[in-house]
């Protein structure tokens, strides 16, 4: 599960974060493998900007599920600080922490510069900073003058996240697991996965390539209900295109009538990797997707306005994956 801590127009930020906790607790109980949270900034509808802080909150309320960043936008941060933050999390919750890294700012250009004045230079140094972060977390860093405490010597899985050929190239070259952001930028997914597998350079930690596809999933008792619930997600993406990033709105009927032709095309392209329907429909659609992509793991994000409906969608999606895995 990837959670963006999406703020709805009837909910405070505090309540939103506690709803994220509720979702994580349910995923933990149902047997989901991971619960990741994403770093975004200066977005009124997303409350997950302090990602490491939230991960500690979520980890403290769950027992088994892996907790991770999906992802930390590394150019926004010092690699040493990230090593210390995630080293702290791993020390508190051993064997449960994932560290996903992205190259984008998770915001607009002006905000990126406010976060870190040399962001664009750091973005170009992303491969170098990934290596530096790996070094800080390695037990072999003990001979260097700059060391991460906590962090050094801890086995924290590091993932490369992305939505382009650049990210797949880096993940393949470094022999790292790779997660693709198909939930908002699916255009290059198939090419990126193929390149990653064909050019994978085995590492000691990861002798074989490993892929995650993150997709949108909205499930309900009927496909008609699921499509209605999904209208809030469509409006969210429409607002992004219009540069009007307000909190998520309640679902509406005929949501596509709110868009002009170009807006509809853009939204449908961004959301083309979405699975919306009842249990049977999503089982068939998602199974075909897995067979085609040969992806190792599916991660879902579920943008639904009503909290109870979102939790129920999470329950249905667990049954969907159980059905697929049983085939």
PLM regions: where:
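N-terminal beta1-alpha1-beta2 module of alpha/beta enzyme domains
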Residues: 1-61, 65
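A conserved active-site cap/scaffold subdomain adjacent to cofactor or substrate pockets
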Residues: 168-187, 192-193
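Short, acidic/polar
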Residues: 14-26, 163-169, 281-288
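Conserved, mostly hydrophobic/aromatic
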Residues: 27, 31, 39, 58, ...
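Flexible, glycine-rich active-site loops centered on histidine and acidic residues
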Residues: 1-13, 75-138, 178
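Hydrophobic faces of well-ordered beta-strands that scaffold small-molecule active sites
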Residues: 1, 35-37, 67-69, 97-101, ...
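An alpha-helical appendage that flanks or caps ligand/catalytic pockets
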Residues: 119-147, 188-294, 325-326
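Active-site mouth loops of central-metabolism enzymes
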Residues: 3-18, 72-79, 152-162, 270-279
